[in-house]
Amino acid sequence: MLDKSGFVMVHMKELEIQELSKENWKGTLLPVSYLSDYYYDIWIEKTEDGFHIPIKKKQFEATFRHLPEDGEYPDRLYEDWWENARAFGIVEDGTLLAAIEICPEEWSNRLLITELFVGEEIRGQGYGRKLIDLAKTITIQNKYRVLMLETQSSNVNAVDFYLHEGFTLIGFDTCCYTNNDIERREVRLNMGWFPNQESD
């Protein structure tokens, strides 16, 4: 089918999100990867009356690359330490194209997004937002007080996406991955979405 400009219009079918059972999907590797030309620089400075902690977007000298094999613990579904996790995803012809895993933190009444993956072949089509919206719906239905996730200061695209989806920065950890995360420009950022609270 041609549009008015003469270009071929391709209508792709809408992919459905389904729950991924622990029995079938436990241990499934999520090939999370990203490239980034920018990072959020974090610096902690002690002052006379407290601390000064500027966070500013800066450009990498060379493109930062995060590959699935990086790190001691690659991303997998239903890790043993997430005892009450649930996973949802998009599967086509037996291939996992996208997934989100959530797990309640019962003692604090918070819901954690423990994994979020969207394959390159379907990025930019709104499926990341749909997975996030599903987690938001579960947060509201179960009356959790906040929906939380972890990302990295090196993954500016992810940070900006979460901000656009109504999340806000609620904390960070400067030694989560190594003892020199600040110097490596890969600081863990904790972000949260609060039900019934408008984003500024």
Predicted regions and their residues:
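Short, Lys/Arg-enriched N-terminal segments with co-localized hydrophobic residues
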Residues: 3-11
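C-terminal "cap" of GNAT-fold acetyltransferases
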Residues: 11-13, 145, 152-156, 165-168, ...
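DNA-contacting interfaces and partner/effector-binding or oligomerization modules
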Residues: 14-25, 32-37
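Short alpha-helical
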Residues: 22-25, 108, 156-157
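Acetyl-CoA-dependent GNAT
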Residues: 29-114, 119-121, 132-134, 138, ...
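Conserved glycine-rich acetyl-CoA-binding loop
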Residues: 93-95, 119-133, 137, 141-142, ...
